[in-house]
């Protein structure tokens, strides 16, 4: 018996809005991130205006930000500019805002101070938001899953 798999059904869902990006999740520890993603291409300590010192790991075009720098520091932000990270319905960097609206349920699209974005979730401390940055040409340029801090 021959098995045929279409390209659409073979697509790996590497982005699950409100949940994960490439298997990485908000709240993970650095050792858990490395177990899923391997060694980062970049690993640095930066200063954040609200959180103080943070650790930022990069895995190609995926950036992982931790609240704090020690072993107990947890992931608070996952961001990508890679066209490879897609939802099960194919939404990702490069998708049009109209495609995002058609395939993503519950999103809200707004322009704030000249910044156009569509998001899922509530901007309430402790909540997770999935944010899709939209370019002036109406395409997704960055996708971020983040824990709302304040």
Which residues make up each language-model segment?
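Intrinsic-disorder/low-complexity peptide segments enriched for small residues
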Residues: 1, 19-22, 102
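Peripheral interaction segments used for macromolecular assembly
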Residues: 13, 52-54, 89
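Second-shell loop/turn segments in exported
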Residues: 17-24, 84-91
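A cross-family detector of function-defining hotspots
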Residues: 28-70, 93-142, 147-150
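A small/polar (G/S/T-enriched), proline-flanked helix-loop surface module common
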Residues: 71, 77-85, 97
């Amino acid at each position: 018996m021959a098995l045929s798999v279409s390209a659409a059904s073979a697509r790996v869902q590497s982005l699950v809005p409100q949940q994960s990006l490439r298997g990485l999740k908000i709240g993970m520890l650095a050792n858990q991130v490395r177990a899923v993603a391997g060694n980062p291409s970049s690993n640095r300590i930066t200063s954040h205006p609200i959180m103080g010192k943070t650790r930022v790991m990069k895995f190609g075009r995926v950036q992982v930000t931790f609240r704090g720098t020690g072993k107990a520091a947890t992931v608070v932000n996952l961001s990508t500019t890679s066209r490879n990270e897609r939802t099960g319905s194919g939404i990702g960097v490069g998708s049009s805002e109209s495609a995002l609206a058609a395939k993503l349920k519950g999103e809200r699209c707004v322009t704030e101070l000249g910044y156009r974005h569509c998001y899922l979730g509530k901007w309430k401390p402790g909540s997770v938001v999935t944010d899709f940055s939209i370019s002036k040409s109406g395409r997704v340029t960055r996708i971020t899953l983040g824990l709302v801090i304040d």
